[in-house]
A protein has these predicted regions:
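Alpha-helical transmembrane segments of integral membrane proteins
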Residues: 10, 14, 40-48, 80-84, ...
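Juxtamembrane helix-capping/reentrant segments at transmembrane boundaries
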Residues: 66-83
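Short, Lys/Arg-rich, polar N-terminal cytosolic tail immediately upstream
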Residues: 1-10
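Hydrophobic core of alpha-helical transmembrane segments in multi-pass integral membrane proteins
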Residues: 25-28, 46-59, 81-93, 151-154, ...
Length: 186
């Protein structure tokens, strides 16, 4: 594959498997399987959560404070983690502790908090963490969707490395953290 095509494919994979997309798909699957009546409430909460984070990211990039929407430089990440954690806590409160989704939201929030704490030493791939989390968390709900998510990890890992967003330890570390956090939802 020529370099231009490889870069285009890597970028497409990175966008298609972005944490927003992955977490939205997992949340919709979990809601459909566990609490269909909550679907309108969950969709509204999810839309607000993604919207708030996306507006924040867009503002950082458009102002020139960040180079990419991925917050690829380690110094860009602490504020991103803070905003995302506030949004996750808000979503958790919106859904309610009694919601069947509460454990998953708490596990995802814990995963992001750990990644944020570790950011001082390693910039874990949130793309990899999100997809590994989704694969592990989806497994009990739909084994074939869980397996499909996990099967996409090598392609996403290649994408993140090819785009030079991460080094191997960051890709592997994000994957391990995500898988462990996803298993905590069982």
């Amino acid at each position: 594959m020529n370099p231009v095509a490889a870069h285009g494919l890597a970028r497409t994979v990175s966008i298609a498997l972005h944490p927003f997309v992955v977490f939205a798909a997992l949340t919709l699957l979990a809601t459909w399987m566990l609490d269909r009546e909550a679907l309108p409430r969950v969709v509204a909460g999810l839309a607000v959560a993604i919207g708030v984070v996306w507006v924040f990211v867009w503002q950082r990039v458009s102002s020139g404070r960040w180079g990419t929407v991925d917050a690829s430089r380690p110094h860009e990440r602490p504020l991103l983690y803070a905003v995302v954690l506030v949004v996750v806590v808000g979503l958790w409160a919106w859904l309610g502790m009694a919601s069947p989704l509460a454990r998953g939201v708490a596990a995802a929030g814990t995963m992001l908090a750990l990644a944020g704490l570790l950011n001082r030493w390693i910039k874990l791939s949130l793309h990899m963490a999100s997809l590994a989390f989704a694969g592990a968390a989806a497994w009990p709900l739909s084994p074939w969707l869980g397996a499909a998510s996990l099967a996409l990890l090598p392609l996403l890992g290649w994408s993140r490395l090819h785009l030079r967003r991460h080094a191997w330890p960051e890709v592997v570390g994000g994957t391990v953290l995500g898988a462990l956090a996803g298993m905590a939802t069982w």
